[in-house]
Amino acid sequence: MCSTCANVLKYYDWDPHIKLVINPNKFLHVGFCDNPLMCCYPELLPEFGTMWDCDQSPLQVYLESILGDDEWSSTHEAIDPVVPPMHWDEAGKIFQPHPGVLMHHLICKVAEGWDPNLPLFRLEADDGSITTPEQGTMVGGVIAEPNAQMSTAADMATGKSVDSEWEAFFSFHTSVNWSTSETQGKILFKQSLGPLLNPYLTHLAKLYVAWSGSVDVRFSISGSGVFGGKLAAIVVPPGIDPVQSTSMLQYPHVLFDARQVEPVIFSIPDLRSTLYHLMSDTDTTSLVIMVYNDLINPYANDSNSSGCIVTVETKPGPDFKFHLLKPPGSMLTHGSIPSDLIPKSSSLWIGNRFWSDITDFVIRPFVFQANRHFDFNQETAGWSTPRFRPITITISVKESAKLGIGVATDYIVPGIPDGWPDTTIPGELVPVGDYAITNGTNNDITTAAQYDAATEIRNNTNFRGMYICGSLQRAWGDKKISNTAFITTGTVDGAKLIPSNTIDQTKIAVFQDTHANKHVQTSDDTLALLGYTGIGEEAIGADRDRVVRISVLPERGARGGNHPIFHKNSIKLGYVIRSIDVFNSQILHTSRQLSLNHYLLSPDSFAVYRIIDSNGSWFDIGIDNDGFSFVGVSSIGKLEFPLTASYMGIQLAKIRLASNIRSVMTKL
C-alpha cells in the first residue's frame, strides 16, 4: 500500500494494515481452477482436497505430502509442499489450496470489507483552461448502476489499467439509417458490450487479456425537426438474442424522440457473474435501438422513402478497466479483431478469382465461390492458396495429340494444381482450329466497330470458354518454342472435352501443342493465366452451374435486408481487343487474411467497413462469418475511384447496413 493511500485511510480512522482472517472450512466445497491467472469459474471445476492434520509433526506433514503426490509414485522425486504463509482461524487442518482458490477468497474478503462511503477525488486544471462542453442528456433508470465493489476487487486481482484523456470524450463508432419505411419493432442498432465499441478501447485491447466495466453510448439524430417518431433504447441481459418484435420492449428501456435536439446518452452496464471478461467473451449485455413509433416526414411522397441518420458515439464508463497485461504481438487463442480485412486504398484491391484490379461491386440475389474463398474459421472449400503465381503441371501425350490431362506438381489438394481456374466450358467441344467469332448475320467480326455494333455475338470457336495461358513448356530433346496453352476443368474423352463443374485429378484439361511425336512425351509446363476465350458470354463466375467445386459450393443470399455482392474486375479476351467481367467473392487481401489469421466474429454478425468514393458517397460493407460481403442498398450506382475503406466495428447481420446512397424506388 502506498503512503498516500495509508494517510487517507488514517485520516478516516482506518488502520492501513488490513488484517484478514479466513476460515479454512469455507474451502472444503469450493472447486479449484487449473489456470488461476485466467479462469474465474471455480465452481465448475473439480474439487481440491489435499489436507493434513495439524496434530502431526512438521516432519510427518512433509513426508505425507511427498508420498501422497502423484509424481512421487512415478518419478520418486520429492516435491516440497506449498502451505500458504498465513494464520488460519479455527484451523483443525492445514490445507494446500490451489493459488487460484486462495486469491478468489482473498479478493472476496477485500470486497466484503470495502467501505462505499470513501470520498471520490476529481483532478481539475487550476486555471480553468480545461473545460467540458455539454455532451448530451444522460438517461438513467434503465438498470442498476455498476457495482463499484466488483470493479475495485477486479483491480486488486489483476492491476489497474492506464488513465488517459481519451476516457473523457465520445468517439465516433458508427452511423445508422432510420428511414420512413422502417416499421415498429425494426432493430436499427445492436451492440454487445465490449472493447469493440470504442476505437481507443479496441486499440488498447491488444495489450490485455481481459476487461470489465460499462460503456457510455451517445446517439445524435440528424433530423431537421419536421420528423415524428420515437426510438426505444433497450438493455438486453447476457444470454438473450434480440428479436425484431415489440416483445423486446418488455425489457428495461427508455424512449427518445426523432425531434430530440440534444444528443442522448445511455450507459451499457456490465452485468457479469465473474470479476472480468476475456476478450473472447461476446455473451455480454447488449444495447438495442428499436423503432418504437414509425418515422414520419410530412413532406415525403409515396414514390420514395426519406429518413435521417442516427450517429453513434461511445466512451468508456467510469468503471471500465482492462486486466492482465500481455505483449501486443502475442495472439489470443480465441481470435483477433477483424479490422484489417480490407486495405485502406482501393489501389490495393484485386480479385480472388483473377488478379486484375477491382473496379465495381455487383449486387446479386446469390453469391457463390469455392476456390480461394476463405471463411472466419481459416477454411476453404477450394484448392488454391490466396495468391497468384504460375501454375505448374506435367503433361504426357503421344502421336501429336494436343489435348491431354495435366498432373499437378504444386498443390494443397492432392491432384489439383494450386491456382487452377474454377469455371468449366459451356458444352461439349472438340478443341481444334482457330477463333470463329461472327455477328447475328454470320459475318466475321474483324474490327472494333463491328464488335461494338453487333446486336448478337456468336462464338463458334472449338475451344471457347477456356482460359488462355502463357506457357513455358519443356521436354528433353524438344528444341521447339513453347506454344500458348488453353486450360479448363473437364473430362477428356479421346479428342472430345466434356464440361464438369466438379474437379479432381482426372479433369485437369490442357489443350496445347507440346510437339509430341509417336512416342509418349512428358513435358514440364509452367502456365501463367492471361486471358479467356469466352467471347460473348456473361461474366465469369455468374453462372452457378459452370462454377467448379470439389464437392460443396459455398453460397449466400440476402440477410436482414442486406444484399450479397461480388467484387468485379475483368480479364482480357482472346482474338477481340476487349475484356470480359469477372465476379469475385472476396478481395484477395481478405482471402489471404482469413487464411492466415483467426478472427473473432459470431455467425449472426458482420464485420463492417465503410467505403467512401472520391465524391464523398459512402456505403457500408459487412463481411459475415462465412467470408461473403453484403451491402444495405439494392443499387450502388457509379462510384468515383479511388475508394477508401475504414473499419467500423461489429454489427448484427439482421440490421440493414448504412449508406448515403439513395436506392432507386419505383411506384407500382
From Swiss-Prot:
Disulfide bonds: none annotated. Gene3D superfamilies: 2.60.120.20. GO terms for cellular component: host cell cytoplasm; T=3 icosahedral viral capsid. Keywords: Capsid protein, Disulfide bond, Host cytoplasm, T=3 icosahedral capsid protein, Virion. It comes from the Viruses. Capsid protein self assembles to form an icosahedral capsid with a T=3 symmetry, about 38 nm in diameter, and consisting of 180 capsid proteins. A smaller form of capsid with a diameter of 23 nm might be capsid proteins assembled as icosahedron with T=1 symmetry. The capsid encapsulates the genomic RNA and is decorated with VP2 proteins. Attaches virion to target cells by binding to feline junctional adhesion molecule A (F11R) and/or to alpha-2,6-linked sialic acid. Once attached, the virion is endocytosed. The record marks 124-125 as: Cleavage. Pfam families: Calici_coat. InterPro entries: Calicivirus_coat, Rhv-like, Viral_coat. Mostly expressed from a sgRNA. Expression from the g-RNA is low and occurs at a downstream start codon generating a smaller, truncated LC-VP1 (tLC-VP1) protein. The record marks 459, 462 as: Interaction with host receptor F11R/JAM-1. Homodimer. Homomultimer. Interacts with the minor capsid protein VP2. May bind to VP3 and Vpg proteins. Binds to alpha-2,6-linked sialic acid at surface of target cells. Interacts with host F11R/JAM-1/JAM-A; this interaction allows viral binding and entry into the host cell. This is Capsid protein VP1. The keyword Disulfide bond applies. Belongs to the caliciviridae capsid protein family.
